[in-house]
Amino acid sequence: MLDDDERHTPAQQDFRCPSEEMTVPPPRGGRRVAVVGAGMVGLATAWFLQQRGVEVEVIERREVAAGSSWGNAGWLTPALTTPLPDRSVLRYGMRAALDPTSPVYVPITLEASLWRFLAGFARHCTTRRWRRGMVAYRSVNRQALDAFDELGAGGVDAPTRPADPFLVCFARDREKQAMLDELGEIEQCGQKVGFDVLTGSEARTSAPVLTDRVTSAVRLHDQRFIDPPRYLAALAEAVRSRGAVITENSTVLGIRDDGRQVVVRTRKGDHRYDAVVIATGAWLPELGHPFGVRIPVQAGRGYSFTVPADRVPEGPIYLPTQRIACTPMGRRLRIAGMMEFRGPDEPLDRRRVHAIVNAARPFLDGVDLEDRHDEWVGSRPCTPDGLPVVGPTTSPRVFAAGGHGMWGIVLGPLTGRLLADAVVTGTVPDELRAFGPLR
């Protein structure tokens, strides 16, 4: 996943599988596959293809992890991996969404594709559709951390750290109750979540970086986190060490299926492969559209920076009302947040950085929010229904892997494992049924 997000496209169509049995012909001839995009999803797909004996080349328009994989919070939290469209998003209202200091921001624009995406997104902000999406996530959430363990056992030299503790913090009782209600709904959909409730004092004892503005917290069990740049660098090195070429700073201009192979066009010429995986994040529709991928993929941009802290917490801290995520990164604290629906290539908006600073300041003690390093914006690929876009397209040799929204890091390795199975065997795993690119 070059960046785990995608650009916009026309309205959704009903999902039609390549066949009723969810099978596609495996690539003919040899086993040479191109993966377009070198973020978490793309690199994990490459690694699992190699695990199955496939020769892989990765093509990246910038550098490894240059997109939404690099600066995100690095949370491996199946407990929180849910469809993005829900009723709480609509509570912000249009006036709040047009405010650049709001956690969810939509700049005033005449871009029709953005408004089509937002209309589709709003239609999915219902309890019924959220539950249907949650059921789709349930099976992949159960396996997500196992895929990281497989990468580690296979030589990816970067740790996943236990999130001990992982604290979801609140200033008001009603905020806590909203989270408890959501966790209850997740469990009603069949996904178990381990947690306990802390007082504000207990939360501050567990994480002294918190101020007394935190009156209560939910401590999630059995979650993890990573340092994204370090992890992605190790994953790329593991892919290279198995013989793959990762070609950076190379833009794919087009993809064509000639009936026998797939032709990938770059500025340096055409290259032939037995199959291609499009894992370009928020730019996925540009290459996927000719192969029937009509699902709008919109950049949901997130911001982050790192700051020094007198007492770096042992695990992540989440402020859900403020949409602020804090992750320990060595001696510094990465602070990330916001959701901004606009073009994936737009420059960083400093108002959004300041909005994070102002929202986080009342809750964090001993943190120098003015000493910011690594200020970053990345484009998360969001879909109207909040589900990824993973599987075969109208071509049996072209596959899509993207649209994970905020969950490209936690679901990237499992996506790679499942999609590698589909490419090699020609059979789409049951876990990917709801995520079909032709839905």
Where are these regions (language model features)?
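Extreme N-terminal leader/targeting segments of oxidoreductases
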Residues: 1-33, 51-52
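N-terminal Rossmann-like FAD-binding beta1-loop-alpha1 element of flavoenzymes
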Residues: 31-57
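Glycine-rich FAD pyrophosphate-binding loop
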Residues: 51-71
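Active-site substrate-recognition segment that forms the wall
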Residues: 72-75, 80, 84-123, 252-262, ...
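Rossmann-like flavin
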Residues: 115-237
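A conserved beta-strand/loop element that lines the FAD pocket in flavoprotein oxidoreductases
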Residues: 240-252
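C-terminal catalytic lobe of FAD-dependent flavoproteins
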Residues: 321, 364-439
